[in-house]
């Protein structure tokens, strides 16, 4: 057990947090830069699909990841709000339509139907409103 002589060693109650920036280098060359806001706020609902081209009549399925991002583009690790997903077009959502973020992200699967056309996945979450992604089914 360690006795802490300076009680403020790990920060003071009510201290001010400031924005920060992390820069990563490999062999002296900058490879990544991250802005870390002092007060991260839910700013962007990112929708990322593994593919946007699907084949009809083959039960072709794609994974879609939803991420809650702050104003610096960082995942909000403690964000756990519900998100409602819906699909328009010749296909279906595999699983429930009401999901909860875990660690700032949640996944959903979209399956193409038997007809060609376009699928539009909509995701609605309180801080972000509604975001959409479209798939082409051939």
Swiss-Prot record:
Listed EC numbers: 3.2.1.23
Class of enzymatic activity (EC top level): hydrolase
InterPro entries, per the entry: Glyco_hydro2_dom5, Ig-like_fold
Catalytic activity: Hydrolysis of terminal non-reducing beta-D-galactose residues in beta-D-galactosides
GO MF annotation, one: beta-galactosidase activity
Alphabetical keyword list: Glycosidase, Hydrolase
Highest taxon of source: Bacteria
Record bears the keyword Hydrolase: yes
Pfam families attached to this UniProt entry: Glyco_hydro2_C5
Family: Belongs to the glycosyl hydrolase 2 family.
Protein name: Beta-galactosidase
Protein source organism: Rhizobium radiobacter
Taxonomic path: Bacteria, Pseudomonadati, Pseudomonadota, Alphaproteobacteria, Hyphomicrobiales
């Amino acid at each position: 057990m360690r006795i802490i002589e300076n009680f403020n060693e790990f920060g003071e109650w009510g201290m001010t947090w400031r924005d920060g920036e992390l820069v990563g280098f490999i062999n002296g060359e900058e490879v990544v830069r991250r802005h870390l806001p002092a007060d991260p706020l839910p700013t962007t609902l990112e929708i990322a699909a593994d593919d946007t081209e699907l084949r009809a009549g083959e039960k072709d399925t794609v994974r879609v990841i939803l991420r809650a991002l702050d104003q610096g583009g960082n995942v909000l690790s403690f964000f756990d709000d519900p998100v409602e997903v819906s699909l328009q077009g010749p296909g279906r959502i595999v699983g429930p339509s009401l999901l909860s973020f875990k660690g700032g992200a949640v996944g959903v699967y979209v399956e193409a139907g038997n007809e060609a056309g376009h699928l539009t996945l909509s995701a609605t979450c309180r801080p972000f409103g509604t975001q959409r992604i479209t798939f082409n089914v051939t």
